[in-house]
């Protein structure tokens, strides 16, 4: 069993060394994503603004918008909660305390039930669909109340055959993992 804190550090180090590979694989993952029934049936998707070592989300956002879908981004809230707000353009985003671009909060625009949520993470287990996220618990808290579809795009550096880490009672399975 690998301690999640150690695994997170190892994964960030590995992913930071493999940014170009992950970016290249992101193109293939997007191609696979748009062929899924979940994507085709969704009128709204939620994703994040990726950091430099994650699968790039800008092409995903652009594809969703060109397909006529509403795009929602997470806004971190107190008590490790998230609210999903509409993406308008990159200039309207503000940098959070975590250094992540987020939409400005507007209670009237919150959508906690987008049709499809693309779930980020650092490690994904193929045999069980569990993930290791960034450690804040934001997505697990959100997903515990969410009833829509979930997908994670998994580049090779995040792909684990089995969960070599402890699965906690609050860890939530991702419905579908898409591998390179």
Model-derived regions: residue spans:
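Residue-level signal for inorganic ion chemistry
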Residues: 11, 71, 118, 135, ...
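Receiver (REC) domain switch-region micro-motif
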Residues: 45, 117-118
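Surface-exposed, charge/polar-rich loops and edge strands
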Residues: 2-6, 13-20, 112-117, 125-128, ...
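N-terminal active-site beta-alpha-beta segment that forms phosphate/nucleotide-binding
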Residues: 1-112
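Charged helix-capping and loop-helix junction motifs
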Residues: 61-62, 132-138
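Short glycine-rich anion-binding loops that position phosphate/pyrophosphate groups of nucleotides
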Residues: 51-53, 122-125
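Short active-site oxyanion
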Residues: 69-70, 128-130
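Short, structured patches in soluble enzyme cores that scaffold and shape functional sites
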Residues: 75, 86, 102, 121, ...
């Amino acid at each position: 069993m690998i301690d999640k804190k150690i695994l997170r550090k190892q994964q960030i180090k590995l992913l930071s060394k493999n940014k170009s590979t992950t970016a290249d694989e992101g193109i293939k993952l997007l191609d696979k994503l748009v062929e899924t029934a979940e994507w085709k049936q969704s009128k709204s998707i939620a994703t994040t603004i990726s950091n430099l070592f994650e699968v790039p989300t800008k092409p995903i956002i652009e594809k969703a918008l060109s397909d006529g879908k509403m795009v929602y981004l997470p806004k971190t809230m107190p008590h490790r909660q998230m609210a999903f707000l509409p993406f308008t353009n990159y200039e309207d985003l503000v940098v959070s305390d975590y250094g992540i671009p987020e939409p400005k909060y507007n209670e009237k625009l919150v959508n906690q039930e987008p049709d499809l949520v693309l779930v980020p993470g650092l490690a994904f287990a193929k045999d069980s669909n569990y993930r290791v996220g960034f450690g804040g618990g934001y997505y697990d808290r959100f997903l515990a109340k969410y009833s829509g579809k979930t997908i994670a795009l998994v580049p090779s550096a995040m792909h684990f055959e089995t969960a070599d880490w402890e699965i906690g009672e609050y860890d939530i399975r991702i419905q579908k993992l898409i591998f390179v």
